[in-house]
Amino acid sequence: MKKNLIIGAATGYKYGPMKYFFTSLKKIDFDGDIAILVSDKIDEETKNALLAHGVILIYVKSGSIEFTKKYAQSRFWKIHRLPHKLLFKLLNTGKNKLCKLSKYVKIFHLISGSRYCYYYDYLLANRDKYKFILTTDVRDVVFQADPFAGLDGEALHFYEQDDAIRYNSYTSYWIKHAFGKKALAAIEDKKSICSGTTIGSFGRMMDYLEKMITVQAQITGRLTGLGGFDQGVHDYMIYNNYFPGSDVIENPAGEVVTLENLDTVTLTDNQELVNRYNRVIPVVHLYDRYPDLKLKALL
């Protein structure tokens, strides 16, 4: 029987700031696999703590991380648009073009963007092992229930945030710089969709990752050094129908709540967040924005 997988990136964190991600999964008796991207220079305390939780560690070379940070902080991006445009055309050919584009993204994109490449690599190497996959942020996420319960078929779920893109300065910035002012104008009145949490069946997730890798490679010349461009790519692609048949779930009606506004949820006497349908929300994202919030998952 195939398992479900939760996979995320935590290359810059020690165990302490992200411990509730793992302890909350233990509380709900999650029986799938947990795979986390970590630096190959991870400290022993963090490494041992993650292994104690049964986490599968996917090592990312620290040299790659350091290079992309230096590149992002340099002035070279001001003149690199044409060289990268030409490089993308050269790489985007042949049967192994996705492999070439993935390596390219790993070199020039911060981990927020290159994580999709590592997710793809891991899933490709374990293609017969998993039924459903949740790609997720780690440090600011906790679990109240199994996020995969009730899923069936070939699902691909994206999760809205509360505000329209025009009111999210970062998302607007990323879309404008990656795809242009006209592209932003066409979708700026639509809700932002969080790239931090996505759930899909194996086949649908692989298609999503392949397209994310390809389009991120394509816009490499438009990077400006500000991390998070994957959010702009994610939203642009969803609203331009790159993923037909996918579901965009209203916040917080589905498996995930992006906790931007406490007015959209209710805290029960059992210290669990429920949505307006009185259903416990399996995944709570951005819980750390409310330090006084007393959740069962944090106890």
Regions from the PLM with identified roles:
Residues I187-K294:
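Catalytic core and acceptor-binding pocket of nucleotide-sugar-dependent glycosyltransferases
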Residues K70-L82, T171-K176, D263-E272, L298-L299:
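Short, surface-exposed amphipathic charged segments that create phosphate/polyanion-binding patches used
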Residues M18-K19, E45-N48, F143-F148, L209-E210, ...:
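A short acidic (Asp/Glu
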Residues M1-Y130, G203:
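N-terminal anchoring/stem segment of glycosyltransferases
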Residues G63-K70, A164-R166, G254-L259:
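A short acidic, often aromatic-flanked loop/helix-cap motif at beta-alpha or helix-coil junctions
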Residues Y116-S169:
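GT-A fold catalytic core of metal-dependent nucleotide-sugar glycosyltransferases
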Residues Y173-D189:
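Short, flexible, basic/aromatic active-site loop/helix in glycosyltransferases
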